[in-house]
């Protein structure tokens, strides 16, 4: 849904802005637009020209025009717009704002085509347009009904909610019914005009208008790219790249009319270094064309390319599809090796950066376990297993107060823990009861600190807990630490990016090496300094991440797959309605390594969203090997 929203400093629109908006809408792979009132004629011209269909609406919201005024306005609107081929439906009011006596007037003035008239949000005249349905909405309607259905508003995108978050669940469910005709995301952009009477602030009227997938200056939020991927007319079937990958994968044609033979696809192979290797730089080592199958809309076939000789030397495969006009449709990426393989291979390629320091040693004195190698030392509380102090070259790195369990309970057992000096390094093995079995810390002679955590491998938790040692509904699960936000200048990382993710909005992110300067952007509110992507939040599939700091930089590497890297806690909007939380609760601490994260809602509570928005659950059976969080920290300077 797009309302007439000029740039913040303006009070009118223009053809150039209409073209910009239409092109942004098409970039999201959308093909239809609705507004709450007749749009500018130049926007309809853009829809006609660029290929967007339009639902033209007589204004009215909850209350309607009386019969005399409604008849005059309906006639003026239809007579003005009737010859625009982009218009496929007339809308009479919105959410109760219709006058039934006006319905027949649309056909009177549209006497050649007599396009269908709908009442947006109502089940009216064989078209069910129910607004903001829950995932299971459908007692004798929607997927369980016998009428064409098309929600004319859904996925409410207030602040960072909705939009592309949870979209896949709804869309896939509705596609199971051939009577599904489409849907309209609310809304295109934040509406925040510049208020010259309020020191030129951009004013979205608190929580009433920061509902956009793009900002007031058309800044792209994370949902922009999530929608673009989920509504791409070319869809990739899920696949991993393993040793058996031969360059072929399944694609589905979700166009309405176009054969896939009219489109093209390319591949690129990226080599992604680590901070220890080349400062964490990306390079392209191969590229070429992908052969797409000649398949009609609705069909699935096999795309393939010939693997270049150096394919296995790469780290990420990037695929990009283009439409028949050569415009990019979507970009996808897959890692060529799993995290542990990537880590081992890169470590083997970086001996020059890993000169030996003095022999690593472990000691336990007065309740403090110390691991030391050269200029790096780490102190642990022997009773809790938590890091107390990290020092590098005489400077304290304020990474501490962890690991703290998230979404579960664990209790360190000092009597079972031990300190050991081994040929592989200085070891502190912290043993636990509850959700954690053990966390082994090992500082090598090169000053690198390894952490190997074994979680959820014992149904009894080793005993000692009278109640459950994990959350019944798992929103966050993993380990968390403290690190002062004031010390951080930025972040460089390899993983999915550049946008933060939610459990139900990972789509739209891709594997690469990314960088962000620190920012405190509040989505949909920080209009004075609206920097996207937001810095704080969850980042998916971390391979490594460097915290940039003038005083306390460090890098952490993941040696297991599927780690969500949480960096700090996003600030809640000040203008949120009645002080209600707009985001799910974050773990305590500042930096977390998680195996599960929460979804974000869209207008209705999480319980009414789809299955991929729901919290996880844990079951442990005898013989389970458990879950792993295996990391390596480089605190060296």
State the predicted function of each range.
Residues 16-25, 31-222, 240:
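Substrate-binding/catalytic cleft of secreted carbohydrate-active enzymes
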Residues 308-348:
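Terminal connector regions
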Residues 90, 140-305, 311, 553-556, ...:
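Substrate-binding clefts and catalytic carboxylate motifs of secreted carbohydrate-active enzymes
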Residues 1-12, 23:
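N-terminal small/glycine-rich loop or linker at the start of catalytic domains
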Residues 2, 282-284, 326-335, 340, ...:
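Residue-level signal for glycine
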Residues 310-312, 343-637:
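Beta-strand/loop-rich accessory regions of lumenal/periplasmic or secreted enzymes
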Residues 248-255, 305, 317-321, 375, ...:
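Buried hydrophobic-core signal for structured, non-transmembrane domains
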């Amino acid at each position: 849904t797009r309302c007439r929203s000029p740039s913040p400093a303006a009070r009118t629109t223009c053809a150039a802005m209409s073209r910009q908006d239409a092109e942004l809408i098409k970039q999201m792979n959308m093909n239809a637009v609705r507004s709450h009132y007749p749009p500018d004629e130049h926007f309809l011209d853009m829809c006609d020209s660029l290929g967007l269909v339009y639902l033209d609406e007589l204004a009215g919201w909850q209350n309607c025009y009386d019969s005399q005024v409604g008849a005059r306005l309906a006639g003026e609107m239809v007579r003005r717009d009737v010859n625009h081929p982009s218009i496929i439906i007339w809308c009479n009011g919105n959410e109760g704002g219709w006058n039934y006596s006006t319905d027949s007037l649309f056909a009177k003035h549209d006497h050649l085509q007599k396009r269908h008239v709908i009442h947006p949000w109502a089940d009216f005249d064989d078209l069910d347009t129910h607004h903001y349905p829950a995932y299971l909405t459908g007692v004798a309607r929607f997927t369980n009904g016998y009428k064409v259905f098309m929600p004319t508003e859904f996925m409410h995108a207030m602040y960072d909610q909705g939009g592309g978050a949870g979209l896949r669940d709804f869309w896939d469910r509705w596609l199971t019914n051939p009577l599904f005709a489409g849907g309209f995301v609310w809304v295109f952009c934040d509406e925040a005009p510049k208020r010259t009477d309020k020191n030129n602030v951009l004013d979205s009227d608190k929580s009433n208008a920061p509902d956009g997938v793009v900002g007031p200056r058309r800044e792209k939020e994370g949902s922009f790219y999530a929608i673009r991927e989920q509504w791409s007319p070319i869809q990739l079937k899920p696949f991993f790249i393993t040793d058996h990958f031969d360059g072929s994968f399944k694609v589905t044609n979700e166009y309405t009319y176009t054969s896939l033979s009219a489109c093209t696809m390319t591949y690129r192979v990226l080599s992604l270094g680590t901070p220890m290797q080349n400062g964490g730089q990306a390079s392209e080592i191969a590229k070429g064309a992908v052969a797409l199958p000649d398949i009609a809309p609705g069909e699935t076939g096999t795309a393939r390319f010939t693997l270049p000789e150096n394919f296995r030397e790469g780290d990420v495969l990037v695929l990009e599809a283009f439409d028949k006009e050569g415009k990019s449709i979507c970009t996808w990426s897959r890692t060529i090796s799993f995290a542990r393989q990537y880590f081992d291979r890169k470590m083997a390629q970086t001996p020059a950066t890993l000169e030996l320091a003095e022999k690593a040693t472990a000691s336990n004195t007065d309740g403090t376990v110390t691991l030391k190698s050269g200029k790096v030392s780490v102190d642990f509380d022997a009773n809790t297993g938590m890091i107390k102090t990290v020092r590098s070259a005489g400077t304290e790195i304020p990474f501490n107060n962890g690991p703290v369990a998230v979404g579960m309970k664990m209790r360190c057992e000092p009597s079972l823990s031990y300190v050991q000096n081994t040929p592989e390094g200085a070891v502190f093995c912290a043993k636990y009861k509850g959700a954690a079995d053990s966390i082994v810390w090992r500082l090598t002679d090169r000053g690198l600190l390894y952490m190997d955590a074994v979680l959820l491998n014992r149904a009894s938790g080793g005993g000692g807990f009278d109640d459950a040692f994990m959350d019944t509904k798992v929103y966050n699960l993993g380990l968390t630490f403290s690190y002062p936000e004031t010390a951080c200048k930025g972040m460089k990382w390899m993983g999915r990016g550049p946008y933060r993710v939610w459990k139900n909005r990972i789509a739209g992110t891709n594997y690469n090496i990314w960088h962000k300067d620190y920012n405190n952007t509040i989505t949909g509110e920080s209009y004075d300094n609206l920097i996207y992507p937001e810095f704080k939040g969850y980042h998916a599939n971390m391979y490594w991440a460097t915290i940039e700091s003038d005083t306390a930089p460090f890098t952490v590497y993941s040696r297991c797959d599927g780690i969500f890297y949480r960096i700090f806690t996003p600030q809640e909007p000040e203008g949120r309605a009645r002080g209600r939380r707009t985001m799910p609760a974050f773990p305590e601490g500042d930096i977390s390594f998680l195996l599960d994260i929460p979804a974000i809602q869209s207008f209705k509570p999480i319980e009414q969203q789809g299955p991929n928005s729901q919290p996880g659950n844990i079951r442990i059976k005898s013989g389970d090997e458990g879950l792993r969080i295996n990391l390596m920290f480089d605190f060296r300077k």
